[in-house]
């Protein structure tokens, strides 16, 4: 069905998510110039560089070897589990689902389309079941946060794709936020901290309560907590006067005013903080590449980081105080913001796509 639609549309260029494997392999037979997109940092295994879900820094040799051994072991274990499950039978005998990540299932798609799965994919990298070789990849990250010398020449760092003027239609807390903003503008400047632990995973109520406790000891700060639709403000208990918690916050509006942010290490929050020049305290929940983002934030000097499940309220308070009072954090992220949002950086993606489309 996908191939039929593409034949009718006859596009000049395909932009496909790096994890949309059926679309990548299925469309390969059409000869349409293709680029892949991702929010990830470089996924391939490179000398002296950890996998993107690791807390470790470059050149921690023994630790990096152990990290990559873990990645391979986890991948093999996941493959075995799937093969011995009901889904494993479906992978072998069909039908193939559009979102499958099973290499067994993708082999059947590759056979039908003439795609050489072994030659054109890389199973040694971080992403399951594989990455792709010889295909341009556009990542919405900045090269300055990458570890090592950067990925292969196919990997292009186009920077944050943040709509800074967007209206968050789902933001049920907009009125409460704007009332707080009005009060803030009637008095002398108070540091504003924004906290969001994402909208995909269930909120870590224990961590959020520790954040509230930290703010309660600092009545000279204002704290806004956006729950991303993953929890109710009532779950946090009674809140001090300087804390506002809402089910959905108008994130870009709040970040435009914030002096520091507490985030979980997701790529969207990382890039939005960069776009607005807001130093970060990353309290990683350990999902996907969050630990790796936490390591990059601290390594670049644009924030501090901890494991969200264990960080204490007193540590949160102390680290926020550092972010708010030590100029180096705001200086570093302001400089990174200038690089990330500069016209040459934005034009790179356009130039690349136009060049690819012109190859047809």
Each language-model region and where it sits:
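C-terminal amphipathic helix plus adjacent low-complexity
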Residues: 9, 313-360
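Nucleotide-sugar-dependent glycosyltransferase catalytic domains
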Residues: 1-192, 199-202, 206, 220
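A conserved nucleotide-sugar
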Residues: 194, 212-227
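A donor-sugar binding/catalytic signature common to diverse glycosyltransferases
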Residues: 14, 246-295
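Nucleotide-activated donor-binding/catalytic signature segment of Leloir-type glycosyltransferases, i.e.
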Residues: 219, 231-249
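Short beta->alpha connector loops at strand-helix junctions that form conserved
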Residues: 37-39, 265, 282-286, 305-310
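Glycosyltransferase donor-sugar binding loop
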Residues: 198-199, 224-232
